[in-house]
Amino acid sequence: MLISHDMHETRVAVVENRRLVELYIERPKRSVVGNVYLGKVRDVLPGMQAAFVDIGLEKNAFLYVDEIVAPEGVAGAPRRDIQSLLKPGQQLMVQVLKDPMGTKGARVTTEITLPGRFLVLMPFSGFVGISRKLPDEERDRLNSIIEPLVPEGVGVIVRTAASGAAEKDLQGDLEFLLRLWRRVQAQAREGLAPEVVYTEMDLALRLVRDAFGDSFRRLVVDDRRVYEKVVSFLRKSAPRLVRRVQAHKDKESLFQSYGLQPDIDTAVLREVPLSSGGHITIDKTEALTSVDVNTGSYVGRKNLEDTALRTNLEAAVEVARQLRLRDIGGIIVIDFIDMEDPRNRQEVVARLTTELARDRTKTRVSEMSRLGLVEMTRKNVTDGLYGVLTEPCPCCGGEGRVLSDTTRRIIVERSLREVLVGGKASAYLVGLNPTTYALVNAPGNNTLALLRSETGKRVNVIADPDVGPIEVRLLIEGKATAAGAEDG
């Protein structure tokens, strides 16, 4: 796991076999998933058995009746109509399940969950569950420890990370979560809707808590303050993992040193090449994501069925990786190349299922149809990399996606830093695309001044229409003088 933090954003990458398989990006406008709000019911819709709740965001949140904790406070209580549960103007505590996406507001629930390192507290559940990924013997051990500790009426899920954890560690995690819940309740009692009463951890700590464990060989962090936060968190929650945390101190950027840029570049492309010469095409719509598999230049060595099987098997691996990398959720339809032999169809689905088993996000895969179609679902929580890195294209009525202004500015400013840090000269003149030049020199953006202060080098930029939108073209490098950059 790699954590890179700079003035613009935090990026967390998961690398398997030297390939980027997961990438998470957090900018000042953070995800609100996991946040708990004291909200106010704005409208109740009996026909949809749902309600709109004002939680202080741009759009009202959407609450389904099935996401409302039953008055009895236990699972399996008789279902009731939403109009008997909620009234306009009523205040209630809700937690965000899905970020706002497009024209839709956030999706929320009243079933609050507070995650810790080993446990997830469910204050309204009364249910104790243990991760099914753990062996039966370990599940029995953990159950015997946890059940006597959990207060009556409170629910707990024991996470996979609890494997091998000592009783004192589990008890400490539970006590921390119970204290946290009491603070959330107190803030909700004293608050006035709409108001946030609990904010989820930042991206770096959240992924360290939820994902980093014994399966990772190392965790490398390139920012001193983030490194110290991560080490402090692990010392309290998983001391044995602290020795796996490393500080990146090289001049070369962390992501550069691991060669991740080519994989990042493909994460927003519609077409992704396969090593055999084939490719997959990914199209995202409001309703679903379609993935089309093509042989491209690959013609095989035997017959059409063999060519289709080999391409489909390679595509199954890449599709699973791209779904994780792009964090694509919802309904996904994969159009594999037609194959006549049912055994070949089963082999491709088995390969896809095996690759998806690495995914922490829940997926369900159907059998392949005779037409080569595989329908699957992947839990949809955020807008994925598309939502962070791109925006609707202004030239085609919003039907396409292009890199957002913020993304282009960050890429160019990061490239400028690499020029200054990696170069031996003390002054540089670089050309930028006119639109990018305007972004870098926008009022209030002091990146150039910060780069000069950080590196002790001077950089001047000019607008050059021959330069690409995210290109940094080095025009002159030399030594700094009172007049600017002198040719060296």
Segments and roles (model prediction):
Residues 1, 22-32, 77-84, 99-108, ...:
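Active-site phosphate-binding and catalytic loops of NTP-dependent enzymes
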Residues 2-108:
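Charged, low-complexity terminal tails
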Residues 14-36, 87, 136-140, 257-269, ...:
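A short, contiguous, amphipathic alpha-helix enriched in charged residues
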Residues 47-51, 55, 59-60, 96-122, ...:
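Conserved glycine-centered short motifs in functionally critical loops
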Residues 64-65, 232-261, 266-271, 275-313:
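Metal-dependent catalytic core segments for phosphate chemistry
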Residues 70-72, 76, 103-116, 137-138, ...:
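A short alpha->loop->secondary-structure connector
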Residues 88-92, 155, 192-193, 244, ...:
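Loop/turn-to-beta-strand initiation segments
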Residues 127-264, 268, 382-488:
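Charged, low-complexity intrinsically disordered tails
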